[in-house]
């Protein structure tokens, strides 16, 4: 997958051209029937989306997502509240527009010539390619030539249908596929992982995020080139909503908030290491439970899962870890740092975690107040790794090379230059392994994404198991002995109560008559 970047110049030019074309006919004031006036009179911006890590998700009661944050900012821009409706698939999203149940679709939708015949696109803010995925260990198709409908299923309304149809007509006459009207892309990806489905097609960003939690998901091939992503609204003669969107995107491009949101959700890099991710998730299951209470106890200024990710990057959660340079423990503290924090044993798990958390808080406190709140942690982590003085040099170098020293996107690009003599020889604090600091922060972000997604999925599975237990009371050994299946009777004698197979071992509770 190519590096995702917002084309800011394109947005700016498009904004100016379209705004100039639309402005004379825009009834911003005086008419109550235009889109903007209707939204403001209602006091609510209605946005339909799909539940996914990138677009919109709810974790521990808090809402996240690139499209969600942009939609919330747009609602604030209009001076109204935001109402989000989550749909299962893309077809249902466009139904909301057709039926007048949504003002906007904000769900990582691809700009497509077929779509723009019927719907109004907004500014294009990042790009993706469509990719065919399979499960690691299964047959990997190298071409679409032999893929058929018994193997490939896609979600309804998926933009790739047009591409598949064109490929079938021009290159692969035997290509066929099935559309499952009842399932969304996320469900189909899960079915590929579980082995229920051979292949599906999804966008490259969604796949990249999915792999952080499910490393067994693999990309077989690219079906399309990079395609721009945009929002959609109704297509009619009223251009007020389109003009407001262009003005909004231009403003957040100019003030830097668009770049910050991109960095937050797309800035973790697109390289994927199957072995490393598998090893990390095994450690989450086998090692983290013992350390989790300590991370929760000492993570005061940051999310405990981020502190856990930092520790894994430092030591792979090994309390006895020691580097050739002498740093030791779960948080790999130097002897001098440990002494300054009052620690007596760097290999003691609690001392190391508490000390590392305090040291990180010290680094965050030093980050200039001009750095946006949601990016301060990345500056602090780079300083944690290579020293705060070298972080000051990185900011200074960013200014000298026409970048923004308060933007993590700009500063991280200069970090590798700290080890190059033409640059470090002119800096106050000299040589630093800036490339290592860059990789350090990127790895931590990837581990955090994996940890948050993995734990969220486990919580979901536990909740489903609890519901199953409520609906299906456990069958006792006595009941199993009466069952017409001899192997169930045998199992009942060895395991007391069985709770593995609801279809065989449980009886649904009778619902109380109302």
Curated annotation (Swiss-Prot):
It is an enzyme of class 4 (lyase). SMART domains: PBPb. Coiled coil: none annotated. In the N-terminal section; belongs to the bacterial solute-binding protein 3 family. Murein-degrading enzyme that degrades murein glycan strands and insoluble, high-molecular weight murein sacculi, with the concomitant formation of a 1,6-anhydromuramoyl product. Lytic transglycosylases (LTs) play an integral role in the metabolism of the peptidoglycan (PG) sacculus. Their lytic action creates space within the PG sacculus to allow for its expansion as well as for the insertion of various structures such as secretion systems and flagella. InterPro entries: Lysozyme-like_dom_sf, MltF, Solute-binding_3/MltF_N, Transglyc_AS, Transglycosylase_SLT_dom_1. The keyword Membrane applies. The active site is at 314. This is Membrane-bound lytic murein transglycosylase F. Its main location: membrane. Keywords: Cell outer membrane, Cell wall biogenesis/degradation, Lyase, Membrane, Signal. It is a peripheral membrane protein. HAMAP family: MltF. Residues 1-30 form the signal peptide. Residues 31-269 are annotated as: Non-LT domain. One of its GO terms (biological process) is cell wall organization. NCBIfam families: PRK10859.1. Residues 270-514 are annotated as: LT domain. PANTHER family: MEMBRANE-BOUND LYTIC MUREIN TRANSGLYCOSYLASE F. Pfam families: SBP_bac_3, SLT. It comes from the Bacteria. One of its GO terms (cellular component) is cell outer membrane. GO terms for molecular function: peptidoglycan lytic transglycosylase activity. It comes from Salmonella typhimurium (strain LT2 / SGSC1412 / ATCC 700720). It catalyses: Exolytic cleavage of the (1->4)-beta-glycosidic linkage between N-acetylmuramic acid (MurNAc) and N-acetylglucosamine (GlcNAc) residues in peptidoglycan, from either the reducing or the non-reducing ends of the peptidoglycan chains, with concomitant formation of a 1,6-anhydrobond in the MurNAc residue. The lineage of its organism: Bacteria, Pseudomonadati, Pseudomonadota, Gammaproteobacteria, Enterobacterales.
């Amino acid at each position: 997958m190519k590096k995702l970047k917002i084309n800011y110049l394109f947005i700016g030019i498009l904004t100016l051209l379209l705004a100039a074309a639309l402005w004379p006919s825009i009834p911003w004031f005086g008419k109550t029937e235009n889109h903007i006036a209707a939204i403001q009179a209602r006091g609510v911006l209605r946005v339909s989306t799909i539940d996914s890590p990138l677009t919109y998700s709810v974790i521990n009661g808090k809402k996240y997502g690139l499209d969600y944050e942009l939609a919330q900012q747009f609602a604030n821009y209009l001076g109204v509240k935001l109402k989000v409706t989550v749909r299962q698939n893309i077809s249902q999203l466009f139904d909301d527009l057709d039926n007048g149940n949504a003002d906007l679709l904000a769900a990582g939708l691809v700009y497509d010539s077929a779509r723009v015949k019927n719907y109004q696109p907004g500014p294009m803010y990042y790009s993706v390619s469509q990719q065919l995925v399979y499960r690691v260990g299964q047959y990997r198709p190298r071409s679409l030539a032999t893929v058929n409908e018994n193997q490939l299923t896609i979600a309804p309304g998926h933009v790739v249908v047009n591409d598949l149809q064109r490929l079938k007509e021009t290159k692969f006459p035997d290509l066929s596929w099935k559309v499952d009207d009842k399932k969304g892309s996320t469900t189909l990806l899960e079915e590929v992982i579980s082995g229920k489905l051979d292949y599906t097609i999804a966008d490259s960003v969604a796949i990249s995020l999915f792999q952080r939690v499910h490393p067994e998901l693999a990309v077989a091939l690219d079906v399309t080139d990079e395609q721009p992503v945009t929002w959609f609204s109704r297509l009619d003669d009223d251009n007020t909503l389109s003009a407001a969107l262009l003005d909004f995107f231009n403003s957040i491009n100019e003030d830097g908030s668009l770049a910050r949101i991109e960095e937050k959700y797309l800035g973790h890099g697109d390289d994927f290491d199957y072995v490393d991710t598998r090893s990390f998730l095994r450690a989450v299951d086998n090692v983290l439970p013992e350390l989790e209470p300590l991370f929760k106890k000492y993570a005061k200024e940051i999310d405990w899962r981020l502190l856990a990710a930092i520790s894994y990057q430092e030591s792979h959660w090994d309390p006895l870890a020691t580097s050739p340079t002498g740093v030791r423990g779960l948080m790999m503290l130097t002897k001098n740092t440990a002494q300054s924090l009052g620690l007596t044993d760097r290999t003691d798990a609690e001392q190391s975690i508490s000390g590392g958390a305090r040291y990180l808080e010290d680094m965050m406190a030093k980050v200039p107040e001009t750095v946006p709140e949601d990016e301060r942690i990345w500056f602090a982590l780079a300083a944690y790794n290579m020293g705060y003085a070298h972080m000051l040099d990185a900011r200074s170098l960013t200014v000298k090379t026409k970048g923004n020293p308060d933007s993590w996107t700009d500063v991280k690009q200069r970090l590798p230059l700290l080890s190059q003599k033409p640059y470090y020889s002119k800096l106050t604090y000299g040589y630093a392994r800036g490339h290592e600091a860059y990789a350090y922060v990127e790895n931590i972000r990837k581990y955090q994404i994996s940890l948050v997604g993995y734990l969220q999925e486990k919580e979901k599975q536990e909740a489903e198991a609890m519901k199953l237990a409520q609906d299906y009371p456990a069958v006792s050994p006595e009941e199993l002995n009466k069952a017409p299946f001899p192997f169930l009777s045998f199992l009942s004698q060895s395991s007391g109560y069985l709770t593995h197979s609801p279809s065989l071992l449980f009886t649904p509770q009778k619902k109380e008559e109302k």
